[in-house]
Each structure stands twice: as C-alpha cells, then as structure tokens.
Amino acid sequence: MKLFLYLMKILLVKLNINNETSRLKAVVLGTAESNGPVPSLEEAYDPKSAEFIRMGSYPKEEDMVEEMEAVAKILEKYKVQVFRPKVIKDYNQIFTRDIAFVIEDKFIKSNILPDREQEIEAISHVIKQIDPSKIIQLPEEAHIEGGDVMPLGDYILVGTYRGADYKDYITARTNVQAVEALQELFPHKKVVSFNLRKSNTEPRDNALHLDCCFQPVGKGKAIIHRNGFLEEEEYNWLVNLFGKENVFEISRDEMYYMNSNIFSIDEDVVISEKNFTRLNAWLREQGITVEEVPYAEISKQEGLLRCSTLPLIRE
C-alpha cells in the first residue's frame, strides 16, 4: 500500500500557475480533429463564427488541424509536456482554455455553456493525474471561462460583464458571482474584475473574454485594446499597473484578428500569429523571441493561441 501511495504521489501532475509568462512545463493543447460539420447560424456561440458561417468561409478541419500541429511542434521544441484531449466525433475541442484553468496548485473546472460539457470529459485522462483535493468545481451559479482569468502574482485579473442584461448576451461568459467565488477561494490574492464590452452581432465590438483585449507579456509588458473595456477607469488601472511605456495598444481591427491572444512559453519566448506584423515587430524590440505560426483559420471562431491552451505547470 505504501508503495502504491508513493507511486501515486510521483505520478501526479504537480500544478503550478502564478502568472502568464513564466517558463511553461506542461500544457493541454486543444484538438481540431473531427471538428464536426459547419454549424448553423443558430448554433454559433459568438459573432465572429456567425460572420464566417454567413460568408461561407467557416474554417476547414484540415486547415485547423495543420495550424494546431504547428503549435504542438513549437511546444515540443521547447521541451514542454503536451497533453491533448481525447477526440470526440464531430465535436469542437479546440479551445481548452474555456473548460478549466489553473491558479497556484488548484485546477478549477469552468461552468461553461451546457452544449460544451463533453469537452471537460475529453481531458479526464489529464484530470486523473491531478491530486483530487486540488480539483475545484465552483458553485453552479458562478459562470466562468478560463479566457477571462489571468493570475498575475498577487493579483487575479478577471473579465466579466456586470450588466443587468447579462442573460441576453451569449458572449457574456463570466459573471459577478464567479468573481466573488474566486475571491473566496483565494483570500490572499487581490481579485480585480473588468467590465468588458459585449456584442452578439459585431465581433469588432465584442471582447468575448479578457484575453481578447488584454494580456501580460514579457517582463512587465502588456498588450491591450482600450475599447474592450466598458469602464475607462478599469482600463486606466491596467495601463497604470504596467506603465504606459510598457503597454502595446492594439486597434479595433487588431483586436478582431485576436492580437492580444498570443501565448507565452517564457518571459522571452512567445507563439504568435504570422500575420501580426506590427505586434511581432514590437515584441522583438522588447527582446522577445517570436515563434510565428499560421492561425488565421482558427481565429475565425473568435479564439487564438491563448484560447486553445490550458497551462498546467509553469516554473
């Protein structure tokens, strides 16, 4: 029995996430295999997917698989342990960031849209390797998705929507109850929430998650889109936190193409979309190595690199 317990201890994944940029050691990368047929407009979860469904240019599975494999190769190049979901036939499993997130050594399951609940079951082989006492299910009324949650040292930054019309927005994914639940779960942290701009119809005016309009990068730098925030003072708080000279402001179109949704392997290494010329040039000016990948097809679903990764361990 002692040997069994010892083996269990060394086999468990020891979670550790305290920020967005420390050296990545283990991650769950989504999959585009067996992604299913083109959804109907009624089945679209966001305005950008709906836009490409209407235009008849919704991304093809083979193109998305190729894009994700390019990311997998870069992660392997940097010796990152990569887990993948078990493939469910005809089911979208690209955006693993939505289904769960890690803060410190806690694995927190998201309360997501009911149609997407199978996605968490598809990573059960990963969850089984986590100490069960570290797995948290938030109360049912606390709606949350990982794209809205960013640990940053003593802070946990959370995107939300505080409007009384929350239920009218399919694009509102994290509510005030979830913000409160996180503060209870991490009383030693400062949980700071940001009221995000939502639109069911115009993707250029929709911050689906916090990482669609903001992300820390490098050493004390950040990418931000002003109009993603409904409250000017909350946007200013973030700019002041990093310092104006350390913030890269992206335009409405750059937000639409998901420029703030790159992914950090380390403080000095990021994976970014190859068409983000202005951003990638700025990142290199900061001394950051930019590993460029094609990801424009996946971005048609209003998600990019951060959205399709679920980090488990950073140094």
What residue spans do the PLM features occupy?
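The feature marks the mature, well-folded catalytic cores of soluble enzymes
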Residues: L7-E315
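Cationic, low-complexity basic patches in intrinsically disordered or flexible, solvent-exposed regions
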Residues: L3
